[in-house]
Amino acid sequence: MEDFKGYLQKGGFKQQHLLYPLLFQEYIYALAHDQGLNVNASTFNEPPEISGYDKKYSSLLVKRLINRLYQQNTFIHSVNNSKDNRFVGHNKNFYYQMISEAFAIVVEIPFSRRLVSSLKEKKEIPKYQNLRSIHSLFSFLEDKFSHLNYVSDILVPYPVHLEILVQILQCWIQDVPTLHLLRLLFQDYHNGNNRITPNKSTYGFSKDNPRLYRFLYNSYVVEYEAIFVFLRKSSSYLRSTSFGPLLERTHFYRKMKHIGVTCCNDFQKTLWLFKDALMHYVRYQGKSIMASKGNHLLMKKWKSYFVNLWQCHFHFWSQPSRIHINQFPHFSFYFLGYLSSVPINPSSAKSQMLENSFLIDTVTPKFETMISIIPMIGSLAKAKFCNLSGNPLSKPVWAELSDSDIIDRFGRIYRNLSHYYSGSSKKQTLYRIKYILRLSCARTLARKHKSTVRAFLQRLGSEFFEEFFIEEDKILSLILPTTSYSLQQLSRESVWFLDIIRINDLVNHLDL
C-alpha cells in the first residue's frame, strides 16, 4: 500500500509509473506476445471479500479477465475457422471492453489527484470553476481580439493510426507493461473490426472507447501545445532572429542568455519566426483560433510551422487547407456555435474650440457575436424539430408523454439555448428558434390529442406556453439592476454566464 501512495504522490509532468503495472505486470508482456502463462486455478475461487465483486471496478476482476482472455486466445488460435465460434469471440470482445474501461479509469487517477492537490494548495477552486465556463472564452476574445489584425482558423487534426498515440505516451510513461497493454487493446480492436479501413480506425476507436480515446487525444494535444507555447515564448523576445524549432521528444533545450536555439531533430527545414508581442491562442475540442497583431507573412510562417510539426514530429499528414488565414474586419469565424467578427463601427464626435466647431470621425473595432440561423435550423432539423426549410414538425416519440412533460421538455430546450446564446449581440435568431420550438410543441400536443393545431391553441390559448418559454431578458432583469439596463438594451448587449461548462447538445450538432 505504501508503494501505491508513492506512485500517486510523484510530482512533475511525467508519470514514472501507473497503478496497473503493479497488478498486471507478470501478464501483460506474455499476453502481448502470445507466450504461455501458468495461471493458478485458485485465482478464480476466492471469496467475495477478497475479489470485491460488490465494487463497480475491481482490480482483481480485471486481472482475472486478462487470464481468461489469454486462455481464450490460446483456444482461438487452435481453431482453424475462428469466425464460426461466435460465443468465444463475443466473450473476448466483452473482456477487452472491460479491460479498456478499467485501464482508462486507472490511468486518470494520478493526473486527477495531481490537479486536485494543486488546486487545494493554491486555494483557487472557485476561480477554477469559473474558468471552466465556455463563456469565459468569449469574454477573453471580446477583450483581446478587437485590437488584432489577423486570425487563423485551425481545425486540429488527429492521428489516423493509433500507434502514434502510443508513441506520444512514451515520453510520459516509462514502464514497458503499460505500453504493451495499450498496444494489445489496439491490436484486438483492429482484428475485431476488419470492416473499418485504416483511415477510419481512430474515429471508430473513439466511438467504442470514448474515455480511453479522450485521454490519449488529450495527451497528444498537450504535447503539441507545449511545443507551440515554448516557441511562442521564445519568439516574443527575439528580434527577427532565426531559431530552429526544437523537437527533442523528452526535454526542451535552451542556450544561455535567453537565445532560443534548439536542436532540430524532427524537422526537415528551419522555420523563421518574427517578434510578435500580441498573439493569442484559444482552443476548444478540435478547433482552435490564433490571432495576431502582426503581418500576413508572420501568420503564414506559423501555418507552415503547424503543418511541419504534425508531419515531422507526429508523423501524419495534415492538409494546409485546414488552416485558414484571414484579416479583420473582413472575416467572420465560427466558434462554439457563435459567428464572431470584429467589424469597424464608425462614429462622429462634435468638438468646439472658441467660435469654431467641427466634427471628428472615428472608427472603433468591436468584437461581436451572432447566431447563424442556417446552421441552427440544420441542427434543429437533425433533432427532428423542423425540416431543412425551418418549418416546425411534431415529435411523435414524445406523443405518449403527459402534456406537462411535453411542454416542459420543449421549454427546457429553449431556455437552455437562450441561456447559452445570451452572448449574442443580435437576438432575432432566438425569436425564430422560439417560434419553431413553440409550434413544434403545439403540433406534438395536437398529434397526441388527435386535433389540429388551430383548434388546440384556441381551446387552451397561446398564454398556455408562456410560463414554459421564459425569455432570457426577463431572467436578466431579475439579476441585474433595472436602473442600469432596460429590456431593450439587454436585447442588444452580450451577457456571458460563468456557469456553462459544456456545449448545448443542439450546438454540438453544428460542429459535425
Swiss-Prot record:
Q: Which gene encodes it?
A: matK
Name a Pfam family for this protein: MatK_N
Presence of keyword Iron-sulfur: no
Q: Where in the cell is it found?
A: Plastid, Chloroplast
Q: Which PANTHER family match?
A: MATURASE K
According to UniProt, the name of this protein is Maturase K
Q: Which InterPro entries match?
A: Domain_X, Maturase_MatK, Maturase_MatK_N
Q: Which GO terms describe its biological process?
A: mRNA processing; RNA splicing; tRNA processing
Record keywords: Chloroplast, mRNA processing, Plastid, RNA-binding, tRNA processing
A GO cellular component entry from the record:
chloroplast
